[in-house]
């Protein structure tokens, strides 16, 4: 009798679950992907991630932000990364053409940015732009492995302020200081550190991206947007990364996120944060 009773209870429970429309497959497991993105993308990426997740309740996109050079090295060393969004083509080329870590067919040029010379509000600086930046009391400058630091060095070379070099990223801040008459230079690990150093008044001027001034309009003054003929285009490429730890659902979601970043909806968000979306893919 006890066995029959148990069978009846089990059958009743099963019928109740069926009546409620319950299916084990209805509850999807959470899918988490990791996106490595340049520090200058921090603000816009948070909104892009939120927008992407709106229609994907089981998806969690985790952003990790630093200089593109630092992130590239982490990926090469085996860090768990599904998508890489770089502030320069150089680092993406390294992962793609040299390391073979980019998933074929997923690489896209997404946005363009512009390097600016900035100062803090009320600084009364005598600097008007790149050509007379030596007149500053101090300069916040990203190191050469950081894209904004490389673009700044390239602009200085093209403007005749620095001697030509086979690899401008190797030009040290000491070399730059000497070329500019001994001005004090604060070497920074990424563009976010440069932005903070100037906005807080720790350094008189610095070079950042136009997008880095978003939300800081009351603290930063743009002295000059450096022309593209000095820096070259500041293209941001994105791609899915070969991740041996990712399962099929994670790999699919990573590809979907890359595809989302080149949609019209994403472009509107990029433009809000001062990025130029008129780029050739």
Go through each PLM region and give its residues:
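Sec-dependent N-terminal signal peptides of Gram-positive bacterial secreted proteins and lipoproteins
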Residues: 1-24
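Exported/periplasmic ABC-transporter solute-binding proteins
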Residues: 20-50, 54, 69, 89, ...
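A generic structural motif
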Residues: 56-62
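Short, high-confidence coil segments that cap the C-terminus of an alpha-helix
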Residues: 58, 80-81, 203
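Ligand-binding clamshell of periplasmic/extracellular solute-binding protein-like
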Residues: 63-73, 80-97
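CheY-like receiver
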Residues: 74-75, 197
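Short glycine-biased active-site loop of nucleotidyltransferases that positions the nucleotide triphosphate
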Residues: 76-77, 108
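A short, gly/pro- and small-residue-rich
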Residues: 98-106
